[in-house]
């Protein structure tokens, strides 16, 4: 497993954009391991795209560990980011460090990702870093706080909100975060934050000036036909390919064309 801090620093220093995609299972991890993508994120977004929930809040630490183990097995050549899910780290510094420690010890992940900018999160970032746990920070739209943010909407649109996010970005970097995810913020704010801190920024709906980009695999592959946010470009249409393949299978089964002689075991 590569060292994610060294990987990100090398690309950041060279001005090379960093590509990240989410992944939740062994099969896709083996495919992504054979691609050029830099890094995989086992996000608590699995609560929505895998479990069918309306938010990320129901995801548990054990579920993150389960999925991260599978991804690490399938993609040994990639660096792996693991989300810490809702209420696995917000209750106390000790609980946060314990949860992060479990993820790193049990999964072989490269780092953990924390959402938020409170004084508690900044202190937790500092304490985790001091404990040898690499921390990936996350600002802007933070899905674990979706109820207090008023839903899934662009953040940092007012001058006060912009200034606060810039300030908190600096504080998180100073606390030891080695990278920062910026989600659903105006492009100009993504650019300003990226230029104001000396760690890589990874954007999702944060414009083209961040140090890299991340997308949910189901979205970029075109597996979710009903999801069309402004920031998303679908780089494939796998939903159509999947339906075509399953319908072809169904047709051959009902016509007794499958299995053919090529797919059965003969007596001789």
Curated annotation (Swiss-Prot):
Required co-factors: Mg(2+)
Annotated binding of 3-methyl-2-oxobutanoate, by residue: 44-45, 83, 113
EC number: 2.1.2.11
Residues annotated as the enzyme's active site: 183
GO molecular function: 3-methyl-2-oxobutanoate hydroxymethyltransferase activity; magnesium ion binding
Co-factor: note: Binds 1 Mg(2+) ion per subunit.
SUPFAM superfamilies noted in UniProt: Phosphoenolpyruvate/pyruvate domain (SSF51621)
Subunit structure: Homodecamer; pentamer of dimers.
HAMAP family associated with the record: PanB (MF_00156)
This protein's name: 3-methyl-2-oxobutanoate hydroxymethyltransferase
Gene that produces this protein: panB
């Amino acid at each position: 497993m590569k060292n994610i801090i060294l990987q990100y620093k090398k690309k950041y220093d060279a001005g090379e954009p960093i590509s990240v995609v989410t992944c939740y299972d062994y099969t896709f991890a083996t495919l992504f391991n054979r691609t050029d993508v830099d890094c995989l994120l086992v996000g608590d977004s699995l609560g929505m795209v895998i479990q069918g929930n309306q938010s990320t809040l129901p995801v548990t630490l054990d579920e993150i560990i389960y999925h991260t183990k599978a991804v690490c097995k399938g993609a040994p050549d990639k660096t792996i980011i693991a989300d810490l899910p809702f209420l696995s780290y917000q209750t106390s510094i000790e609980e946060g460090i314990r949860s992060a420690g479990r993820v790193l010890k049990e999964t072989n992940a490269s780092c953990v990702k924390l959402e938020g900018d409170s004084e508690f999160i900044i202190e937790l970032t500092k304490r985790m870093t001091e404990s040898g746990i690499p921390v990936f920070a996350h600002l802007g739209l933070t899905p674990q706080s979706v109820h207090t943010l008023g839903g899934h909407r662009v953040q940092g649109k007012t001058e006060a909100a912009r200034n606060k996010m810039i300030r908190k970005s600096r504080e998180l970097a100073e606390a030891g975060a080695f990278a920062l995810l910026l989600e659903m913020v105006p492009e100009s704010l993504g650019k300003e934050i990226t230029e104001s801190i000396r760690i890589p920024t990874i954007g999702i709906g944060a414009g083209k000036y961040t140090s890299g980009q991340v997308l949910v695999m189901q979205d970029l592959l075109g597996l979710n036909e009903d999801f069309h946010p402004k920031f998303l470009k679908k780089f494939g249409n796998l939903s159509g390919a999947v339906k075509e393949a399953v319908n072809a299978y169904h047709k051959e089964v009902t016509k007794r064309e499958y299995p053919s002689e090529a797919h059965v075991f003969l007596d001789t």
